[in-house]
Amino acid sequence: SYLSGAAKTVAVAGTHGKTTTSSMVATMMDRMGMDPSFLIGGVVEGYDTNGRNGNGGYFVCEADESDGSFLYLNPNVVVVTNIEADHLDHYGTLENIEKTFCKFMDLVGEDGTVVIFGDNPHYVELARSTGRHVVTYGFGEGVDFRCVPVAGRPRLQDQPRERGDYRAVHKREGS
């Protein structure tokens, strides 16, 4: 797409959680020294803006599914938080929404990755139906990356490879 240019693009979509998730991805990439550009539907905490032109060759965007315009993106990685019956004025049925999300996930191409909420087997089935590389995350057993409490603090576990835990702290209101 025009906005991402030649940058490797991470596009975040879903009925809920797009702004939070895309903000987290952009912030993590920036703190890892990747200096991403980003365009997000809300102000990113710590940046006081919803968009930035970075120099790292990466672009993180909030992908809006409400009217199907996310199909105009050219993502390398797609993150899908959830798929629910929303925007029925445009899609008509949940089945049509799911078909459109499958088209969106298919945009990553053969060398791309789809990251999807793995606690919902139907979402995983939809993602895998595209034939793309799928990575799952969630709270339950069997996901690739699992959020679990460890010593009272949340941790993100890399399940299949057993490489260890990653500390992922959620900042709560007033903390």
Which residues does each predicted region cover?
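Adenine nucleotide phosphate-binding catalytic loops in nucleotide-utilizing enzymes
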Residues: Y91-E98, G112, R128-S175
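Phosphate-binding loop of NTP-binding sites
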Residues: S1-G118, H122-R132
